[in-house]
Amino acid sequence: YKAKLKSLRALPQALKEVLERIPADSHPMDVMRTGVSMLGNLETEQSFEQQQDVADRILATLPAIICYWYRYSHDGVRIEENTDDDSIGAQFLHLLRGEKPNELHEQVMNVSLILYAEHEFNASTFTARVCASTLSDMHSCITGAIGSLRGPLHGGANEAAMEMIENWTSPEEAEREMLGKLERKEKIMGFGHAIYKDNDPRNGIIKIWSERLAQEVGDTVLYPVSVRCEEVMWREKKLFCNADFFHA
């Protein structure tokens, strides 16, 4: 199966030309949405029996879609989308950075992708199923799902959490600001869950990898700040981190 996905990574030239026209300040989710939609125009699904192959093709091309746009719009580089990496996570990092990732980075990326893929019913998968219920094609279903995932209350939660964490330079400042947010009844992203009531089992896994990344780069701010935020929210509101927080 890995060999099959590797054989499906190449992007059509017409899709590359579209990606080159997307502005550099576009949101990556918008780029993926447009990329999948354009792929559907170029490789139109002809029958229901093709849907597994179409799904594999989309899965194989998404890393190249986002990285081709990013490297061209930011660096002026037209990347070669095929690499010798076996995993999707490794290929994505390789294309993004222009060099093969180390083992830790590959592991973290793959763990992250697995944790999100193995999650339960959510807004984006619901959107995809609504599209599928009308017998729409796979590209339309995935395009709709990406549009749903684009929202700040869904896929944007980890982005919002990171924006918050990056503002603080110490655990003490983080605690002070978190208490202020709670007093003002501001929404704090990355905590609580609609289904999980006691804890999010994904958080226990990604938190370990987050700490390993922090240790690798000698981080003395982001991870300690994140841990303090987790402690404050549990102490004050009995709210636990969901998967998005330490993914950030």
Residue ranges of model-derived segments:
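Hydrophobic alpha-helical bundle cores within soluble ligand-binding/oligomerization subdomains
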Residues: 1-248
